[in-house]
Amino acid sequence: LHPRVRRQRQMCIRDRTKRGQIGKPRIQIKADYGFSAPTMLPEFVDGAKYMEVMNVASQFSSGKDMYTQAAINATRNGTDPDLYPNVNWLKAVTKDYVPSGRVSLDINGGSERLRYSLILAYYGEKGMTVTDPGVEYDASNKLSRYNIRTNLDMNLTPSTEINVSLGGYILNQRTPGYTTSSDENPRTPFTDIIKLAFKNTPIVHPVIYSNGQIPANTSQTNPWAAATHSGFISSYISSLQSVFAVTQDIGKLWHPLKGLKAKATFSFDTYAWNSFLRTKKQTTYMATGRDADGNLLTSVTNEGDDYLKYSKEAGGNRTMYMEGQLSYSRLLADAHQIDGLLLYNMRDYVDADATSAINSLPHRTQGIAARLSYSYKGRYFIEGNFGYNGSENFSKGHKWGFFPSVAGGWLVTNEKFMESTASVLSKLKIRGSYGLVGNDQLSGRRFAFLSTITSGTGYVYGTSGNQTINGRFEGDFGIEDLSWETVKKTDIGIEIGLWDCINIQADYFHEKREDIFMQRKTIPETAGFNKNPWANFGIVKNQGFDASLEMNKSFGKDFFLSLRGNFTFSRNKILEYDESEAMKQTTRARTGNPLNTYYGLKAVGLFQEEDFKADGTLVDGIPNHTFEQVKPGDIRYEDTNHDGKVDTYDYQPIGRPSVPEIVYGFGFSARWKSFDFSAFFQGSTNVSNMIQGDMLIPGSGGGGLGNIYANCDDRWDPNDPYRQ
C-alpha cells in the first residue's frame, strides 16, 4: 500500500503518461474505429397483442373489454396507422448501431539534458438517438473530445532535474433538448428519452401523423418528438492539468548521502463546463377521426413554441496541490536493497458549483506519510507504511488519523533451488499485505462538529390567519467526537510466470469497514432533533478474489499476439447497522445483508380458484393481502412474519444488489509488422436493477402508460391455471 493512498480519496500526483526518452524523435500515429450497439433491450408486444392482453385484464377487473375486435384487427393490419398506430418506441428513437473513432499522434525524443513527449488525440462518437432530416437545427446526439499532453524533463545540473507536465482536453457534446435531469452537470437527456420509450404504449399514437403533425396526449411526451423536435443542448467542457516538480539528488552533492533525494511538487488543475440550452416545445395533436373525405381530424393537446428558447448553465472547480518529499534508495553489499520515503502534502479544492455558503468554502486537507522497505537479493521483501492525515470535518482532537500498513513478499524463483525450473516456471511470487485506510467524507455534510442554524416559517397570527413570523431553528446537530471512518484491508496474492510468456495473478482480499458515517436511525422524536445526528456507527465486511491472465508471444519476427483476461468477485455484508434489536430479528433487517440490496415482497405463486370462498374472500389459513382485494391469477406473496396478513412488515431482500458482484473482461491484441489490431470485451453479473411503476405496470398513469413484455403468454390462464 503506497503511503500516498492512506486516505480513500485522491491526495497525490499520479503521472502515468509517457515521458520523453533519449534519442531521435519518434513519431507514432494510431487510429481506432469501432461501433456501439445496445445488446440487451427488452422485448415488448406489438399493438394488437397489447390490446388483447389488456382486454383479458379488463375482463377480470370489470367484466368488459377495453378494445373492440375491429380496433384490434385494424391495429394488426395497419390499415390506418394514424387512428390505429402500432409503434415499437425503442426502435423508433434508437439507431441499430453508432460509430466511434479515435486518432492519436505521439512524438517522443530528446537528449541527456532535455527530453520531451507530446501527445495529441481526438475521439468522436455518435449517439444512439435518431434525428429528423426535416428539422432545420442539429438535434443529433454526438461527442467530440480533443486532448493534448506534453511532458518536459530537463537536467539543470548533473544533480538537479525539473519536470513539467501540462495536459488538458476540450469536449463538445450535443444532445437533444428534452431533459428532466436538472441535477446533472452537464445534462445528458438520453436516459430521459429511453424512459419515455419504456412508458409509452404501442397504441398511444403514431410516431408522426401522415399530415406532418406531431402527436402526443396531454399527460405524456412523444418519445420520438423528444429526440428530434425538442431543440438541442450544446455543452462544452474544458480541463487543464499541470504538474511542476524539482528533484535534487543530494547524494551527488555529498557522497556520504548517496541515494538521498529531495523533491518538491506543485500542481494546479481546473475544470469548467457550460451548456447552451436551445429548447423548444412542439405543438402536439391527437387524432379524433376522419371527415367525409377521409381527411385526418385532430385537436391540439399542447401549445408549443414558435422559436428555440435560450438559457445557459455553467460550473466548474479547481484544485491546488503541493507536496514535498525526501526519498532514499541504496543497494548495500550487492544484497541489501533499502528504500525510504517521507513526504508532506496539502490540497485545496474549490467547488464553483457550490449551492451553499458552506460548500463554497475551500475544501482543505493535509498530511504526512512515510515508507520503509527492505529486500534481500531480490528474494525477500518487507515494507512498512504509515499515513497521518488531517481533515477539516472533525473537531480539535479528532482531526488527525493514523493509518499504518505492512506488506511482505517472497520471489521464490530467485532461489537457487528453483534454477532447474526456470525454463518453465519463469516467475513465482507470494505476497501479502495488511493495512488501515481512512475516509473523512460525509455525504452532503461539512464541518460535522458544528451545528447549523437555518430559517423557516414560524407561527401564523392575525384575524384572517394570513400573517406569519419567520424564525430560526437548529438544522444539523454538531457532533464533537465524530472521527475517521476506517477500513482494515488484507490481501494475499500469488504471481506466476510460465515460459516467459504467460503471466497469472490471483489475489484474495478482505476488508472490514468500521465506524461508518451514518445518520442515526433509532433516536426517538422526543429527543428534539430536527435532523438525525451523524455518528461513527456501522460495520461492513467485504471479501472476494481477483484474477488475471495474460499471454504475450512473438511468432517469428513479424507477428506478435497478446491475450488477456480478468475476473473479479466481491461480496459484502453489513455486520452492524443502526436498527433496533427487534428489527434485526425480522426479514426487513439491513444487518446481515449486502449493501445496495433491494427490499420487497417475495412472490410465492399465484392465487387459484380454490383459494377463495364463494363470497370472494380468502379461505382460512391464507394470509390476507392488505394492499388490495385479490382475485384468482393475482400474485400471492409470502407472509414472512406469520401474522396472518401481507403488508410492508413482510418485506425481505429480493434479487441481487444494485452493484455487480462479478466483473470480468477478456480481449486480445495482434501486431503484424507495422499494423496492429486489438479488441476487448467486458461485462458484469450478479446484479439486479429495479424496474417499477410506469416502466413495468401496463395501464398505469391513468391507463395510458406501461408496456407489456413479450413473455406475457406465460401469464396465468383460468382455463389452464397450473400450466408451467
Language-model region placement:
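Glycine-rich phosphate/pyrophosphate-binding loops
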Residues: 115, 380, 672-692, 699
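Transmembrane beta-barrel wall of Gram-negative outer-membrane proteins
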Residues: 91-173
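Extracellular/periplasmic, surface-exposed regions of secreted and cell-surface proteins
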Residues: 151-159, 165-170, 179, 191-197, ...
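Non-catalytic regulatory/gating segments with a bias toward low-complexity or hydrophobic composition
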Residues: 14-15, 244
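Single conserved hydrophobic/aromatic residue that forms the stacking wall/gate
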Residues: 2-9, 13
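Outer-membrane beta-barrel transmembrane strand signature
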Residues: 70-108, 117-121, 206-251, 340, ...
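Short strand-turn segments of transmembrane beta-barrel domains in outer membranes
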Residues: 24-49, 77-106, 120, 128, ...
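Conserved small-residue
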Residues: 28-79, 178-179, 185, 554-658, ...
